[in-house]
Amino acid sequence: MLDSIRLQNFKTHRDTEIKLGRLTVLVGPNGSGKSSVLQAIELLRQPAKRSAYKSIARHGEVVGECEIQIAGHHANGKPWSRTSIDAPLMGSWVGNRPDLDPTQAGTKEFDASLQAVLLMPDPESMAAPVRITDVSPQLHRSGWGLADVVATMRDNDDDSFQALQDALRAVVPQVERVKVQRQLITEDFSKYVAYRLLFDVAGRKDIPASTMSGGTLLALAILALLHSPQRPRILLLDDIDHGLHPKAQWDLLKQLRRLLERFPDLQIVATSHSPDLVDELDPSEVIVLTLREDGTSAAKSLTECPREDMLGVLKAGQLWSAIGEDWVKADHRVSYRDRRAHRPPTLSTISASHVQDP
């Protein structure tokens, strides 16, 4: 399990350290560096490649050495730490670092701890038919391959397939059944057989995945990945609330918590823009990011917010909405009294619409 990650000169992150728990949700404005944290973790799980550095430089500048440091612990509680990437951003490739590939360094436990999958789903990709091959099914970053993953689960593990459908119905009650059919595809003078996702929804049969909402497909992709035999130890979810009604967001979070309880080695790191979803989190599970005036990322736990009087009174999403992100830019050494100069809203200035009964 990962306990922390530190990014230096990685995209907008000049020097950012983030503590990670079993469930960590990153929030903040667009472009504040949330997705970059997920991408950095994903980069650790595979041998470093030259092409991986094409998108790292910030604004095309030479910003020095890029370094990603991680720390965690094994299942037996033994801690570990490692500097995983250390290469000039715009210079020549450094190819003599065995720690760039954990398997080459001979640390199998370390490699297992970084079984991470990044999901940045695209509705069109998730709905796409998937050509049937002998290759083991794999859910790609965009969600492509979902039909193959579901078909394999249906054919080889009926219990998991039924559990998947039950979990999806808990999030999207209108879905009565998930189906996978074979379909002959004609494309550029060639033909092949593909798996195609269909849904029974509210009494209607065989609704194509292409007509389903992106939120439904997202929920299916997340739950299929976590119910499959290929379940990763670390699931990285970009925009976990995308296309989901607030109640569906809460219900999806409930399913994720059940899976975290069921699988002690599972860890989830996600990004979100939804105060409704954040309302169902503990402040310790929320990391707030923003950009400083110089364009670099700043990050702090919501538990570090300057309004201690609001902690424990407002839900996490309400607290985030009330105080915003500017406080994250403040130096850790600035006192609470000094931070009051920012004059965040008091409880009396928060409208009743922001406060819900617990």
State each model region's role:
Residues 1-47, 53-65:
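Pre-Walker A-like glycine/lysine-rich segment at the N-terminus of P-loop NTPase domains
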Residues 15-20, 82, 206-208, 298:
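Well-ordered beta-strand positions in beta-sheet-rich domains
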Residues 233-234:
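The start of beta-strands in P-loop NTPase/AAA+ ATPase cores
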Residues 238-239:
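Walker B catalytic acidic pair
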Residues 251-358:
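C-terminal lobe/lid and adjacent interdomain/linker elements of RecA-like ASCE P-loop ATPase modules
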Residues 45-230, 317-326, 338-358:
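Phosphate-coordinating catalytic segments in nucleotide- and nucleic-acid-processing enzymes
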Residues 17, 115-118, 286-288, 299:
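Conserved beta-strand scaffold positions in the cores of enzyme catalytic domains, especially
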